[in-house]
Amino acid sequence: MRRNGKEGKDRAPGRPQRKGQEVASRPWIFRGLDRNRVTAKNILWHELIGLKAKIIRASHPELVGIEGYVLDETRNTLTICGERVWVIPKDVVELEFEVGDKRIRINGRELIGRPEMRLKKRWRR
């Protein structure tokens, strides 16, 4: 019960009011707010989550050819969602990122480290 006995609206702004009005939405992947600003020069210091990635070369032959969107990034791994979800170690692969109509190749060893730590390395140089 609400203050002074008044019933308030039991919903968040922009949401359906009644229980049966929920809209089933398709799954989507957050691809970053400024993903169009990614270039070959700044990809090392940019957020990789949401970019489309493909593995070009790897020390393990089963990793070659995996492609999908980057879902998560840790210090030493990338989580890529394509046909299924793969956790890929950064240090053993060469990746190709698709940004708009450009393709950017980068060695995974250059990506080792958390994104915020890679940015610090840039400013220390």
Curated annotation (Swiss-Prot):
Keywords in alphabetical order: Cytoplasm, Endonuclease, Hydrolase, Nuclease, tRNA processing
Principal location listed in the UniProt entry: cytoplasm
BP-aspect Gene Ontology terms: tRNA 5'-leader removal
UniProt keyword annotation of Hydrolase present: yes
Molecular function via GO: ribonuclease P activity; RNA binding
Reactions that this protein is recorded to catalyse: Endonucleolytic cleavage of RNA, removing 5'-extranucleotides from tRNA precursor
Domain of life: Archaea
KW Cytoplasm (keyword) present: yes
SUPFAM superfamilies in alphabetical order: Rof/RNase P subunit-like
EC numbers, comma separated: 3.1.26.5
Residues covered by region (Disordered): 1-24
Enzyme class: hydrolase
Basic and acidic residues: compositionally biased ranges: 1-13
GO CC terms, sorted: cytoplasm; ribonuclease P complex
Locations listed in the record: Cytoplasm
Binding partners and assembly: Consists of a catalytic RNA component and at least 4-5 protein subunits.
Family: Belongs to the eukaryotic/archaeal RNase P protein component 1 family.
Role this protein plays: Part of ribonuclease P, a protein complex that generates mature tRNA molecules by cleaving their 5'-ends.
Protein name, entry field: Ribonuclease P protein component 1
Organism: Thermococcus onnurineus (strain NA1)
